[in-house]
Amino acid sequence: PGAFRPEDATAFYEDTVGTGHLLELAAWHLSSADYIADTLRLQGMAVQGQVLDFGGGIGTHALSAAALPEVDHVWFVDLNPHNQAFVQQRAQSLGLADKLSVHRDLSSTGDVRFDAVVCLDVLEHLPDPSAQLLEFHQRMAPGAIALLNWYFFKGHQGEYPFHFDDPALVDGFFRTLQAQFLEVFHPLLITARLYRRS
């Protein structure tokens, strides 16, 4: 009981959720197949070279990106060790293990400059999403693309208790986004957006 505290976010996603989060993500992907398919189409239109999938969950987008001929390597980053093991196993079984590496955090990816960043349904779970945008910007190559979405809303009935929605945090996020990135039009009617590093 009580509020989800920003200082607890890392431990929550790394330790507390266990395999339950993996199963919940898999079920959500199955029930949202049309939406997931559209985000995969958008990713296929936009990514190339070195791709970061940040907070990649069960790895659907990372594995799809790794299968693209335009992609050299996918750097899958997720705090949850169960998600990491699941994605490694899936990459191995799909013959993509050479094009995909699994990491706990962005700092363990070395000094790679990314040509594309994929961060879907993650930013609203971070206690400082503006800082994450700045870190992405710093690690992106000139002209790189970011595929992002977010939902800074706890819900009308509190159905998203692990989303941060403080108005000052959200305002700071949009100010950072607008200062560091330029939105790129795409024709798909989905919440995911494309941005070019400014």
Question: What is the predicted role of each segment?
Answer:
Residues 1-112, 133, 149-150, 157, ...:
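Conserved N-terminal segment of class I S-adenosyl-L-methionine
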Residues 143-151:
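Conserved beta-strand signature within the Rossmann-like core of class I S-adenosyl-L-methionine
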Residues 125, 129:
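Di-metal (Zn2+ and/or Mg2+/Mn2+) metal-binding site signature of metallo-dependent hydrolases
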Residues 122:
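Hydrophobic adenine-recognition pocket in adenosine-nucleotide-binding enzymes
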Residues 131-142:
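A short glycine-rich, Lys/Arg-flanked "PGG" loop and its adjoining helix->strand segment in the class I
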Residues 118:
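A conserved beta-strand element that flanks and buttresses the S-adenosyl-L-methionine
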